[in-house]
Amino acid sequence: MTQKIDKYGVEAQFIRSDIMKIAVFGASGGIDKFVLKHALDKGFGVVAYVRNPSKVKISHKNLIVTTGELNDYENIKKAITGCDAVISTLGVPMKFTYESMDSLAGHKNIIKAMKEVGVSRLIDWATPSVHYSKDARSFITIIPGIMATILFPKAKKEIITIADAIQSENLDWTIVRFMAPKDTPYTGNVKVGFGYKKMNFSIAREDIAAFMVKQIESSEYIHSMPIIGS
């Protein structure tokens, strides 16, 4: 049975103490529900930090759902305490402009809490608007940034600022970049590159989630920003 935790939080307690534990932020949306599914399928213990627990439709003995806001630092810290890694799929509004950068504020609290409780592994996301030192100059590394500048300038700024904040800290981070998540069937086949490999922008949300979860037990892309597509 899933243990529900109220907004004040408690430290994660699972039936088994020998399993890897991860905290997932943004666990009630499109990609996020698949992150929960694949993490639980791998036998991980999962603490899902959400604003609205009724949106979490999965029930599992190794899933704890904790309710909180992104500005609630103490509750975020409690969710991360005892975990081995963090996955964030916190979104940003894909609008021309908007008022507050809630995802950035939440990331600052997540990073601060990780450092305070001694958790170093972070898997996060961005778009190819965020440039990486190993990127080749190609359509997929250039055009998304131009499009975002025209259509979603504030979202682009927030995503880049989040990526900069993650890289500035002494964390074992991986930032998974993608362009066009779709509600298409899971394939299990993901193309990975840095602009030199031809791929389609569109990719199934579940494929994104599975790739992010896979990074928990892999060191291949630590301090790296792979671009994934289909």
Per-range role (PLM):
Residues A136, P185-V190, Q215-S224:
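Glycine/proline-rich active-site loop of Rossmann-fold NAD(P)-dependent oxidoreductases
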Residues A163-T184:
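Conserved beta-loop-beta element that borders a ligand/cofactor-binding pocket
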